[in-house]
Amino acid sequence: MATKLQDGNIPCLAATPSEPRPTVLVFDSGVGGLSVYDEIRHLLPDLHYIYAFDNVAFPYGEKSEVFIVERVVEIVTAVQERYPLALAVVACNTASTVSLPALREKFDFPVVGVVPAIKPAARLTANGIVGLLATRGTVKRSYTHELIARFANECQIEMLGSAEMVELAEAKLHGEDVSLDALKRILRPWLRMKEPPDTVVLGCTHFPLLQEELLQVLPEGTRLVDSGAAIARRTAWLLEHEAPDAKSADANIAFCMAMTPEAEQLLPVLQRYGFETLEKLAVLD
């Protein structure tokens, strides 16, 4: 079986939810960003968290770059109008690769993006073969290829783009079983290789939600690498050194873009992650 790469022991701070805490937005097109939020919360439990997901335009992997940039800026603006933000995390690889410049130009608070963990994977691989598992959009974008050229030019990079895996992760959080046969079919190009990747980059924030199932399908000894812990450390540093004094004593809250039955069914899941309520955010559909 494969193994999940651990990032070491991360200290936790005592939470004081009744006091004003820095407000941090974690945004994704779907629920994949919860994997990043979980890493940040583990390191920084005493923040006021907002989780926003775009269930109207989900998934972003097949959308144009222009659409994604305009949409993400619009949503972050709408959240900022409700709650002044100390920091925002774009917990979506696809959105991060195209929207960060526009967000950083518009807002005066730090904006953290998520990029595939190519650099650490290149350092970890023993056989020199690294797999990148991401959306088709992330696989195709020039930013991803620039990361590979910069940090993994001596490695053999095998890329798989899958929208279906995003859907599988969403379904899992809705309580559905994940088909191992479906994962085997998606991963077939690697599973058929004489020497498959020994290190796999989870290049979509949805995919850590499937790590348990991936461990059952990938060859024994395969390492899974994602950027969640690194994003948490970056968030902590920015909050200490560069973030504005934007705080709230309110409870953590989640926003969807449309209050559909599917979104309502996510409330128990969101509550397990510490978000007491789910509201519709007023943006143009």
Swiss-Prot record:
It catalyses: L-glutamate = D-glutamate. One of its GO terms (biological process) is cell wall organization. Keywords: Cell shape, Cell wall biogenesis/degradation, Isomerase, Peptidoglycan synthesis. One of its GO terms (molecular function) is glutamate racemase activity. Pathway: Cell wall biogenesis; peptidoglycan biosynthesis. Signal peptide: none annotated. SUPFAM superfamilies: Aspartate/glutamate racemase (SSF53681). It comes from the Bacteria. The active site is at residues 92, 204. Its EC number is 5.1.1.3. Substrate binds at residues 28-29, 60-61, 93-94, 205-206. It is an enzyme of class 5 (isomerase). Belongs to the aspartate/glutamate racemases family. Provides the (R)-glutamate required for cell wall biosynthesis. This is Glutamate racemase. It comes from Escherichia coli O6:H1 (strain CFT073 / ATCC 700928 / UPEC). The lineage of its organism: Bacteria, Pseudomonadati, Pseudomonadota, Gammaproteobacteria, Enterobacterales. The gene is murI.
